[in-house]
């Protein structure tokens, strides 16, 4: 069931924008290519050529039951000129879905120079343009066949959709779709894609977009303004990003989603059978979005990376399980660790080689007793040589390190020292002088001080000449004196010391 253009415009799928004078204008992009060749600067397509009859031919050319295909304008319209339409909000070119849910996306070449022509029909929808690009360095793709058909001014050329497989992904079609910031809102696009997928009878060649992927595309449309890709109901086209950093991130996410889909069992082969809303099994394929950057193609991963990624994740899970087992085994007590350390040290010490083993392995040199004696003699000769090199006393005297000595000078030095000492002793003060100066304050008063004659104490030693009998008589006399004549207190008599007889 087709819907009219007015209903689609009301729903927000199509936009109809007019200038003040009723003219339709589209922002142009410089360097527009037609299969790699630049367009002429004077080629302009009038609005009368892109009118309701041309659109009717495009709609009638594709039946709803036919396989998915891309439709290109006839060469008469392409070579004569291009349609230009300018939006009051933004000058960026965008993607506009076709006016019919069963119609196929129409790919229009962007013009080289912007031109505005009065539109005869006010109800003509805004056909915003996309770019067909084919770099010469890459191998020929299915879109490369457009060049041969564009020369024929016949019916519009149809390109069948290539079935997309998950591993390895097919080489991408060189079609770039630029999405403006102020383009159609996401809700209208999602509703359009779901409506088209539910209304069309799907065949093997059709592949729709899953709701999870549609949500992912909406998230990328919200947060990634430079790298934006729009999933349509019949095909998914690669997008040309402005930066190569986004390419690497999107390729990583694609590889992860492919692996998760394979591991979850959603894909048993190239196609997946699911029951539709009417109970009929519909064959669907999850499309693969491959993004290529022509400025820097070295960052794009190879197809072998996608094939090898399937065998990486089970190995990583096994390694993680082994690491967890090792971590659990290491949770032992500190006492056990100490015991292990002591045991390991004891084992290492017991395994130390002996001196003989080291000598056999030539680690330690073999030494006999004679060799040891020779080494000691060599060390002794070195020491004696060093000691013999010490300077003599005469050399030290010559260097004024040692002073020369004479016997007469030494005796005179000794005499001078004695004179100093006697002078100091003769100048000592008496006890009375010390009391007057209050130096001997603690000196006891009951001590009687008597002047004695000066004599040499060392000269007179009578006790050295006493015999044993004289000593015995002296001891006997002392004992008798202490026992009879000396006054002793009765309580301290036992403390009296008597000499042995």
Curated annotation (Swiss-Prot):
Tissue: Expressed in the gizzard, and in neurons from central and peripheral nervous systems.
Alphabetical list of InterPro entries matching this protein: RPEL_repeat
Pfam families, per database record: RPEL
Region (Disordered) location: 21-46, 295-329, 382-415
GO BP annotation list: actin cytoskeleton organization; actomyosin structure organization; cell motility; stress fiber assembly
Function comment: Binds actin monomers (G actin) and plays a role in the reorganization of the actin cytoskeleton and in formation of actin stress fibers.
PANTHER family found in the cross-reference section: PHOSPHATASE AND ACTIN REGULATOR 1, PHOSPHATASE AND ACTIN REGULATOR PHACTR
Subunit structure: Interacts (via RPEL repeats) with ACTA1.
The record's note on its domains: Binds three actin monomers via the three C-terminal RPEL repeats.
The protein, known as: Phosphatase and actin regulator 1
Source species of the chain: Gallus gallus
